[in-house]
Amino acid sequence: MHPLRQITARTAAVAAGITAATTLALVTAAPPAGAATTSATGEYNAALKAVGSQGVHFDSTAQQNGATLDVTGDAGSTSGSQSLVVKSNGITERMTARVVGKTGYVSGNAAALQHEIGLTKAQSSKYANTWLSFPTSNNGLDELVGGLLSSEVAKELEIGGPYTYGKAATVAGQKATAIIGSVATQSGSKVPVVLYVPTSGKPLPIKEVTNAGAAGGASAIQGTVTFSNWGEDKSQAAPSKTTSLLKLIPASSSTTTTGG
């Protein structure tokens, strides 16, 4: 659900023209009078603690190099799902990912199967819009469904310090405190991230913004994730008919384990 992680890992969207971002300076507001950096750290830690292992609905969008990625999904206790759309260079890729227990499932159009999963053009045409299954213990394919269980949500929200306060805002009708941190790209550079939590009440995240000052230009990623329905636990059903993805992908694409 994190835009940067979705682009560099989960959706393998480098093939769609979205690459690792470079650092963009972020102008931040001064902390409230009398507040120290440790206070921002404390609020960030309180937000992760409040999340715990709660389910949630999320919507995210990211842009870079003229490519866009839109994702919507739900994380539950034993199952979860997300649907994504990648648009780049006149090509639209659509894919749905689902996890039920210890098995992951993906279904996508031919473009998504070829560019995001790595199937051949012939395989992508044959298996387009059908369900492909794999064990979540598979190192590599597991990223396709990472963050879709409620026990994984807090980890998806992790950002690095030092933490500072940004400018307070009204987000989704709520007065919110902005906590600024960063995440690292694959190249080792850092991208600023702003996490918005309610100013009062339980600090369950409302929104997360990556590179708030960027506009999805040639070298800078910009993304947002919004959260709602904290505590939900939607149950996803396993598809009735599937094909093993492990039998289709090149052996070098992942570390194969039993199952799938």
Which residues does each PLM region occupy?
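A mid-sequence, solvent-exposed acidic-amphipathic segment
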Residues: 150-191
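Gly/Pro-enriched, hydrophobic low-complexity segments
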Residues: 174-241
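One face of beta-strands
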Residues: 54-62, 67-88, 93-97, 102-106, ...
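Short, basic/low-complexity N-terminal boundary segments at the transition from targeting/disordered tails
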Residues: 75-82, 140-156
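N-terminal leader/targeting segments and the immediate start of mature chains
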Residues: 2-74, 79, 234-237, 241-243, ...
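Acidic/charged, solvent-exposed loop-and-adjacent secondary-structure segments enriched in E/D, K/R, S/T
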Residues: 107-149
